C-alpha cells in the first residue's frame, strides 16, 4: 500500500472514527484503525465490536492495499503535522510497519493484518428515513442528559427512538429516563418513518452520532432494524447494535392532570437553584421549594455547611405547598428550556412534576420529588 493524502482530509476522517476506539483494549486489533486504499479513496474504519464508524477521503493511490495501525497514535501524529502538509502512507509486506512521511518528519508504526479486523454487518437494515439534521440534534440534546448510567438497568442505558401516532399525526419521538427524571422530545415524523421498529440506542452511540452531526449536511440518513441502527452523514457512517431489552411504559409516569401550574423566569430560577445548592450535601443535593402565591422560597440545609435561602418571584395563585427536588436534576431541566420562561405543573409533594417549555411544546420533562 502506498498513497499520498492532504493532512486536512486525513485529520478530518481520523477525527471522525478514532474516538470509538477505547484507550484500553484486551483485544489488540480493536486498538487499531483499518486503512483501505483503492481507486482514489482512502477509507477508514474503527470499532469496539458494539459500534463501527467508517469514513473516507480523496487520496492519490499509487499502490492499493489494506492494513491496520494504532488509532490514537496515528491521529496524534497527523494532528501535530503542519497545516497544508501532504502526508505519505506506505506499507509493504517486507516490513511490518506503516511508514508516515510529511516534509522532514518520518514515523514508523506497528501494524496488524487487515484480515483480522472485525467488520460489522449491515444486514437487516431495511428501514431508511432522511431526518433533518437540526431536528435530530434537537431530539438528542433535549433528552440525552436523562439517560441512565446504572448498568444494572441496562435497558435505560440508551435513548428510546420510536414513532407514535397521536391525534392522527405521526411523530418521531426520543425518550430517556433514569428512574428519577424523564425527558421526552418529538418532531413530525419524516417520510417513510411509519412502521420503523422502536429501538434503544446506546448512550455511547448517541454521543458519537451527535458529534458527527456537527459536520453533517442538511439531513442524516437513518436506517433501523430491531438489532441495529445506522446513521449516515455523507461519506461517514456509524453502525451500532441496539440495546436488547424492553423500554418501560413511560407514558404511565407522565402526569396528565397536574392542576397546580406555576410559571417562572427560567434563568433567574436556575441561578437561584445553583446558588443555594452550593452548600447542599453531594449525595442528595436536595433543595426544598416552598411554593405560595407570587413566589417560591428555595431552602437548602446541610448539618455541616449551614443553610441557604433565596426567594424567586413566580406566577402562581394556588394553594401553598412544599416539595423537594434534586438540585442537579432541576438545573439539567432548566438548561434545556429554550424560551425565557418555564412552566411547572404540580400535583402534590409526593407525585411526579411535569415541566414544559412554552416555546417548544414538543418537549416534556418529568421530575420525581424528594422527601425534604
Swiss-Prot record:
GO terms for cellular component: cytoplasm; DNA polymerase III complex. Its main location: cytoplasm. It is found in: Cytoplasm. Keywords: Cytoplasm, DNA replication, DNA-binding, DNA-directed DNA polymerase, Nucleotidyltransferase, Transferase. One of its GO terms (molecular function) is DNA-directed DNA polymerase activity. It comes from the Bacteria. GO terms for biological process: DNA strand elongation involved in DNA replication. The keyword Transferase applies. InterPro entries: DNA_clamp_sf, DNA_polIII_beta, DNA_polIII_beta_C, DNA_polIII_beta_cen, DNA_polIII_beta_N. Belongs to the beta sliding clamp family. Forms a ring-shaped head-to-tail homodimer around DNA which binds and tethers DNA polymerases and other proteins to the DNA. The DNA replisome complex has a single clamp-loading complex (3 tau and 1 each of delta, delta', psi and chi subunits) which binds 3 Pol III cores (1 core on the leading strand and 2 on the lagging strand) each with a beta sliding clamp dimer. Additional proteins in the replisome are other copies of gamma, psi and chi, Ssb, DNA helicase and RNA primase. Confers DNA tethering and processivity to DNA polymerases and other proteins. Acts as a clamp, forming a ring around DNA (a reaction catalyzed by the clamp-loading complex) which diffuses in an ATP-independent manner freely and bidirectionally along dsDNA. Initially characterized for its ability to contact the catalytic subunit of DNA polymerase III (Pol III), a complex, multichain enzyme responsible for most of the replicative synthesis in bacteria; Pol III exhibits 3'-5' exonuclease proofreading activity. This is Beta sliding clamp. It comes from Caulobacter vibrioides (strain ATCC 19089 / CIP 103742 / CB 15). The gene is dnaN.
Amino acid at each position: 500500500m502506498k498513497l499520498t493524502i492532504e493532512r486536512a482530509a486525513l485529520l478530518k476522517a481520523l477525527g471522525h472514527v478514532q474516538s470509538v476506539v477505547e484507550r484500553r483494549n484486551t483485544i489488540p486489533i480493536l486498538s487499531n484503525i483499518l486503512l483501505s486504499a483503492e481507486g482514489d479513496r482512502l477509507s477508514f474504519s474503527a470499532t469496539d465490536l458494539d459500534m463501527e464508524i467508517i469514513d473516507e477521503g480523496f487520496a492519490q493511490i499509487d499502490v492499493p492495499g489494506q492494513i491496520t495501525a494504532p488509532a490514537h497514535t496515528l491521529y496524534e501524529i497527523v494532528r501535530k503535522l503542519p497545516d497544508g502538509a501532504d502526508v505519505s502512507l506506505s506499507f509493504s509486506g517486507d516490513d511490518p510497519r506503516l511508514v508516515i512521511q510529511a516534509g522532514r518528519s518520518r514515523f514508523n508504526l506497528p501494524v496488524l493484518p487487515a484480515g483480522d479486523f472485525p467488520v460489522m454487518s449491515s444486514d437487516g437494515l431495511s428501514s431508511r428515513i432522511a431526518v433533518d439534521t437540526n431536528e435530530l440534534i434537537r431530539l438528542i440534546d433535549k433528552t440525552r442528559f436523562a439517560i441512565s448510567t446504572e448498568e444494572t438497568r441496562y435497558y435505560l442505558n440508551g435513548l428510546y427512538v420510536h414513532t407514535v401516532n397521536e391525534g392522527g399525526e405521526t411523530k418521531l419521538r426520543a425518550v430517556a429516563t433514569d428512574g428519577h427524571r424523564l425527558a421526552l422530545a418529538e418532531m413530525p415524523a419524516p417520510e417513510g418513518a411509519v412502521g420503523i421498529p422502536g429501538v434503544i440506542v446506546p448512550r455511547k452511540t448517541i454521543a458519537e452520532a451527535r458529534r458527527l452531526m456537527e459536520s453533517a449536511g442538511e439531513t442524516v440518513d437513518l436506517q433501523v432494524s430491531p438489532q441495529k441502527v445506522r446513521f449516515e452523514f455523507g461519506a461517514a457512517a456509524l453502525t451500532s447494535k441496539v440495546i436488547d431489552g424492553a423500554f418501560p411504559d413511560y407514558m404511565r409516569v407522565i402526569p396528565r392532570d397536574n392542576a397546580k401550574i406555576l410559571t417562572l423566569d427560567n434563568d433567574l430560577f436556575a441561578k437561584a437553584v445553583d446558588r443555594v445548592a452550593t452548600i447542599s450535601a453531594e449525595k442528595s443535593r436536595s433543595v426544598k421549594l416552598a411554593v405560595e402565591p407570587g413566589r417560591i422560597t428555595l431552602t437548602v440545609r446541610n448539618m455541616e455547611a449551614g443553610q441557604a435561602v433565596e426567594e424567586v418571584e413566580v406566577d402562581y395563585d394556588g394553594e401553598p405547598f412544599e416539595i423537594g427536588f434534586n438540585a442537579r436534576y432541576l438545573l439539567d431541566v432548566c438548561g434545556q428550556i429554550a424560551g425565557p420562561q418555564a412552566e411547572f405543573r404540580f400535583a402534590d409533594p409526593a407525585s411526579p412534576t411535569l415541566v414544559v417549555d412554552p416555546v417548544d411544546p414538543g418537549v416534556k420533562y418529568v421530575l420525581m420529588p424528594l422527601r425534604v
